[in-house]
Regions:
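Non-catalytic, mostly N-terminal accessory regions of nucleic-acid modification and defense proteins
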Residues: 1-201
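Conserved S-adenosyl-L-methionine
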Residues: 179-229, 233-235
């Protein structure tokens, strides 16, 4: 059963990777492959946050009998999205899309200081606002492509999303002329580290240089498979 689950997850991750890599092809040419991650990564984060927010809103509406005020309370959401900063609202903009994306992500970071401080603002705003590299038409194509799928937890659980993103990072690393080791650790190395650590239920796994969280996700998978008879809720903090 565990093997079938893993195979299903890998198939889903590969499908999502293919979808994300199509986004890379949209900006190929104006953007060198060494810089793909600087555009795809923040946009993926932004779309994911917005879609998870929508899922949480829907759940809150159901549990409250349709109370929109209740559904919009910060307590109902993992991340707060200020007015005008949701993916769909930026999608409806007709010009200066790069600046709109940067502005929305900055405001989301400000609204979530305990969880997103320094996360979204680390991405270069100059790359998004330089129309000589990416004009509004290209950014529009990128937004519309990612809008074809919902990227929330219901469609893509965290571990599957992590797997797809890791495959994408590996592709970036393989194609990059830069030092790939700065942002990608091979899955085989991550898996070996987790097996050596042998985390147990109730313990905390700490990765001070977690990057995209690949080792933390592998630790959760390890616990879920090795201790399958002990139902435990695992959290990434």
């Amino acid at each position: 059963m565990a093997k079938k689950t893993i195979n299903k997850e890998l198939t889903g991750a590969q499908d999502l990777y293919n979808f994300l890599f199509e986004a890379c092809n949209i900006i190929r040419g104006p953007v060198s492959q060494d810089n793909f991650k600087d555009y795809i990564t923040p946009l993926l984060y932004y779309k994911r946050i917005s879609d998870v927010y929508d899922e949480e809103t829907e759940e809150a509406l159901i549990s409250s009998g349709g109370d929109k005020e209740y559904a919009s309370l910060p307590e109902q959401h993992r991340f707060v999205i200020p007015d005008g900063c949701h993916w769909q609202e930026v999608r409806e903009r007709t010009e200066n899309l790069g600046a709109a994306i940067v502005g929305a992500m900055r405001q989301i970071e400000i609204a979530n200081p305990d969880t997103l401080y320094g996360v979204l603002s680390m991405f270069s705003s100059q790359k998004w606002t330089n129309k000589a590299i990416l004009n509004d038409s290209k950014i529009r194509d990128l937004i519309e492509h990612l809008s074809k799928r919902k990227l929330g937890n219901k469609d893509y659980p965290a571990d599957l999303m992590g797997d797809a993103y890791e495959i994408l990072l590996k592709k970036f690393a393989d194609d990059s002329k830069a030092q790939a080791g700065e942002f990608y650790t091979p899955r085989s190395v991550v898996r070996l580290l987790v097996h050596i650590l042998d985390p147990q239920p109730g313990e905390t796994v700490y990765d001070p240089a977690c990057g995209s969280g690949g080792m933390l996700i592998e630790a959760i998978r390890y616990l879920s498979l090795i201790h399958i008879s002990e139902p435990t809720r695992h959290s990434l903090i």
